[in-house]
Amino acid sequence: MKHAKQISIIILLLFTYPIFSQDIKPEEVKKIMKKVADWEIKHHDDLAYRAQNSRLSRGKHDMLDWTNGALYVGMSKWAAMADSEKYFDWLKGIGEDHDWKLHMRNGYYARVFHADDHTVGQTYFHLYRKYKDEKMIKPTINQFDFILYHPSKTKMDWKSPFHQDRWNWCDALFMSPPLWVMVSNLTRDRKYIDFMVKEWKATTNHLYDKKENLYYRDGSYFNKLDNGTKIFWARGNGWVFAGLSNVMDELDPNDKDYPYFLKLYKKMAKKLLEIQTPQGHWAMSLLGQKFYPTPETSGSSFFIYGLAWGINNGILDKATYGPAVERGWNAMVSHVNSDGMLSYVQPIGAEPGEAYPDKTEVYGVGAFLSAGSEIYKLYGGK
């Protein structure tokens, strides 16, 4: 009965979702990005659209929470493309309202090391590059200096005390590492990059599966199987791949550590090309396509962003990777409803699960806007 139900779902999806082959035009990319960005800003405080399948996704997100931080990363990219200053104004207002501080959940010392709470700093640095106002970045630099002078000595093991003071869950590689490179570039001080590289390697040594070229979400998944397959969560690996792209985008290609990231990026890109679904998305359990036929737009958008970024920067061959990017982007666009809401965003979690046609989440919108920014360039946008 279970297998019959799965087959029925797959057949339904094959008939529901078209095989995407329509040409991508830069003006249409910009149009759909605006529609999604405008919908999100208008409905940012409306909890009715948020998936409600866990206690973690019921309340309003703090404006500096990682969920919103991921949104702001994508919104910053859209703001740089838009024909209006209102998106920069919206982002700037958030920073001003919070004195340009990073998220301080549960008090300063309780979370000073936590990667999630660093995410919003990436947007502060994007805004600094536009407005040249040092108050936008000073709190971030001060906090990172504190971390450098008082580095966490906890182990990477998931059960270690204060274990998330280190980047021991794969999502962290999106949240914090790009910001360390930004700080280094601004201050012209190598110590921030050195710290980032050391911690990234520690995370990779802990979570990266060298056979599959994918990351476990955290150490609690090492010995678990889902329908007989290893559990590689799509959004978790999306965080990694987008974070990897963002680190490389900030890092000088001549930097001594760039080849390390380049090698890792190429391995992941090759794997992602192999496991993309015919419909254009990636299964929520990356190696379990037949068990997770429902589309999911946050992890997939991050993959599209990273792949398109690689083509645009001459790292990936367009003839090889371009069709996958095109198929993926068209699939994501098909899940934007007529009002501009991006659907099928998996709720907050740590493993494969469910996604819904009438629900969204802020980080999914951020991923979509990030993807659109590179798709726009790839198809001739100026």
Label each PLM-derived region with a short phrase.
Residues 30-49, 89-107, 138-158, 190-216, ...:
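Long, well-ordered core segments of solenoidal/helical folds
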Residues 171-186:
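Acidic/serine-rich, low-complexity amphipathic helices located in mid- to C-terminal regulatory regions
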Residues 214-235:
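Acidic/Ser/Thr-rich, low-complexity mid-to-C-terminal regulatory regions of eukaryotic proteins
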